[in-house]
């Protein structure tokens, strides 16, 4: 009887641990954020050129800040989640990109990795995460556009990161060189959004200082570059 009781207790503890881990994994990737929207999204119609934007708060805030852009381009679908890093993008890439059957995915990477949002920053690992997303997309017949990390003079929520701009430049250079080698279109948001002194996001394009999040004017700059890049793929 004692042995059965011990086995029962062990099973309960194991099940609790598995459930806890599952909840932790789900909350880390935030699969629930777009689960309902993904289910309700119809399959692309014949001739529809669906584009999915994968990213963080910069992508997440875009439809709220510039809803008219998405009304004019209903084929462009945002799948950004505020605060997320490339590690989380990779976890939810199948659910929030591949399952939507887009023709193109645009990946805006890096900001929150550098801001240490999910742990210590490792440029090579962030780069590898980007490469893995590209591999998954291409294996599923999805074209890829890589979009640079935007200028970041610092992070208000992470003051200990004192070399943000140097890290942004280094990561962008690495991804851009690889994109050129692989003939993957690359959008240089960084240069277009940089301040005149090269130290931060242009204040005219930012909602905050140091600039991390674009305002409506900043998104309009990004929209022009995005449409140019997409136009080259059609």
Tell where the protein language model's regions lie, with residue ranges:
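Bacterial Sec-dependent N-terminal signal peptides
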Residues: 1-24
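A short helix->loop->beta-strand "cap" motif at the edges of active sites that frequently abuts
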Residues: 140-143, 184
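Catalytic His-Asp segment of secreted/periplasmic serine-dependent ester chemistry enzymes
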Residues: 151-234
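Serine-esterase "nucleophile elbow" of acetyl-processing enzymes
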Residues: 22-103
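Extracytoplasmic/secreted cell-surface and envelope-processing proteins
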Residues: 114-119, 123, 154-158
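Conserved, well-ordered alpha-helix/loop/beta-strand core segments that scaffold catalytic motifs
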Residues: 106-110, 130-131, 145-147
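Charged helix-capping and loop-helix junction motifs
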Residues: 122-131, 165-171
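Cell-envelope and extracellular/periplasmic
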Residues: 78-82, 109-110, 114, 118-119
């Amino acid at each position: 009887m004692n042995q059965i009781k011990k086995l029962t207790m062990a099973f309960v503890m194991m099940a609790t641990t598995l459930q806890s881990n599952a909840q932790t994994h789900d909350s880390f990737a935030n699969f629930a954020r777009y689960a309902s929207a993904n289910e309700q999204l119809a399959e692309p119609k014949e001739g529809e050129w669906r584009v999915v934007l994968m990213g963080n708060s910069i992508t997440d805030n875009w439809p709220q800040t510039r809803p008219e852009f998405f009304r004019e381009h209903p084929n462009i679908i945002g799948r950004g989640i505020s605060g997320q890093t490339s590690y989380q993008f990779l976890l939810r890439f199948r659910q929030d990109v591949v399952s939507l059957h887009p023709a193109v995915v645009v990946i805006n990477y890096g900001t929150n990795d550098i801001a240490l949002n999910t742990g210590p920053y490792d440029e090579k690992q962030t780069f590898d995460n980007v490469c893995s997303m590209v591999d998954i997309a291409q294996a599923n017949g999805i074209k890829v556009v890589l979009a640079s990390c935007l200028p970041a003079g610092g992070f208000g929520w992470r003051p200990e990161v004192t070399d943000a701009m140097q890290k942004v430049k280094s990561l962008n250079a690495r991804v851009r060189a690889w994109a050129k080698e692989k003939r993957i279109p690359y959008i240089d948001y960084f240069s277009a959004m940089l301040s005149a002194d090269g130290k931060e996001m242009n204040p005219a394009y930012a909602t905050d200082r140091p600039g991390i999040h674009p305002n409506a004017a900043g998104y309009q700059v990004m929209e022009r570059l995005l449409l140019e890049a997409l136009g080259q793929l059609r």
